[in-house]
Amino acid sequence: MPIGQVVARRLDPPLQRLSRQLSRGLASRAAEGPWVEPWMNRPGYPHDQLVAGVGPSSLAYAPVRYDERLIGLLVIESIDAVDKAATTEALPALVEFADLAGALVGRDLARRANMGRVHDHISNIISRRAFLPVFQPIVELEGNAAVGYEALTRFTDGSNPEAVFAEAAAVGLGLELETAALVAALAAAKTLPESAWLNLNASPELIIAGEPFRTLLGGSRRHLVLEVTEHVVIADYVAFRAAMAALGPDVEFAVDDAGAGFASLRHILELRPAFVKLDRSLVAGLEADDARQAMIVGLRHFARATGCRLIAEGIETDAELAVLRALEVPLGQGYLLGRPVPVGDTRRTVA
C-alpha cells in the first residue's frame, strides 16, 4: 500500500480520488503519531475542494505501521460538529483499529513487496544472462576416464544456485530461468569432447512441456542425460514417461540424489532410469560404515538386474573412492575427481 493511502469509513468517489492525491506532508506528519485537525478549505488545494464536497468538519488520522514502518494512514471524518470534540473522542478507537489493520495486512504487504523485489531480481538475472555454465566430470572409477559431464549453473554475484532457482520458482519465473540456463549450457558444451555425454538438470514441468523442450534440445547432437532430483514431485508418471519417449533414443534419464529420501525409490521404480545417482549422504564416511556399504551393494544389484548404471556423487576422499571401486560402482563424480569448472578448463579437471 503506498504511503498516504486512505482507508475511509465510506467509499465515496470524492474520498477515493482524495486517497490518490494526498500530499507527502501527510506521510511526514504521520511519523509524529495520530492527530485530529479541523477541516480548512484552503484555496489552491485541489484535494481540499474534494473533501469539502463531502462536508466534514474535522478529520482524525492514525498511522498504520508494520515492523516499525509506516505502510498507510487510516482517516475518519466528522460531519456532526463544528469543533473537534467528537472526532477527538474517536481517536483512541481509530488508533486501535489502525494497529489491528497493520498486524493483519502488514505481513502480506511485506511479502508482496519482497516477492516483487525477487521477481525483478530474477528477471534482471535472466535478461543480463548473469550466470555461467560450469561442467563437472563423470568418471569411470576403473581407469579414471571422464565419460560425461554434468552441467551446473553459477551466478555471477556468487548467490547459492539452489536458492536462486527456488526463488525463481516462487515468483513464477522458474521455467524461464531454467530454460535460459539450459540454453547457455548447451551452447558452451559444444566444445566438450564429442564422445562425452552431457547431464542436464531439468524439472518435470519443463520436460512435460513437450514441443518447446524438444525444440530446446533439438540443436544438440550430443548424447544427453536429463537429471531429475528426488526432491521434486512428479505428479503424472505416465505423462512424464511419454514426454521422455518423445525425446528419442539419444536422450536418457537419471534419478538424482538417490538415498536422500523416499521419493527417489518411486522415481526409480516408475521411470526405470538409465542412471541412478547415489546421494552424497550414502558416500560420506562410506569406508567406516557397513550399513552404507550394504545399501550400495543392494542398489548395485538392483542396477544390474534392471539395466541401469550407478553414479556415486560427492566423492571427496581417497578412502571413499577405494571402497566404491571395491563395491564395483562403475561411475563417480565429486571434488576428488574434478570440480565444476568453465568449459575451457574441463581438460584439466580429472585427477
Question: Which residue stretches match the model-derived regions?
Answer:
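Catalytic core of bacterial c-di-GMP phosphodiesterases, primarily the EAL and HD-GYP domains
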Residues: 174-242, 314
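Regulatory sensory and allosteric helical modules in signal-transduction proteins
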Residues: 3-52
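EAL-family c-di-GMP phosphodiesterase catalytic domain
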Residues: 5, 204, 223, 227-235, ...
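Signal-transmission/dimerization alpha-helices at domain junctions
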Residues: 67, 93-112, 167-171
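Sensory-domain boundary capping and coupling elements
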Residues: 64-79
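Active-site core of bacterial EAL-family cyclic-dinucleotide phosphodiesterase domains
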Residues: 115-167, 333, 338-342
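A short, aliphatic-rich beta-strand micro-motif
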Residues: 57-65, 134-135
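Regulatory loop-to-helix N-cap segments in sensory/regulatory domains
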Residues: 77-94, 158-159, 285
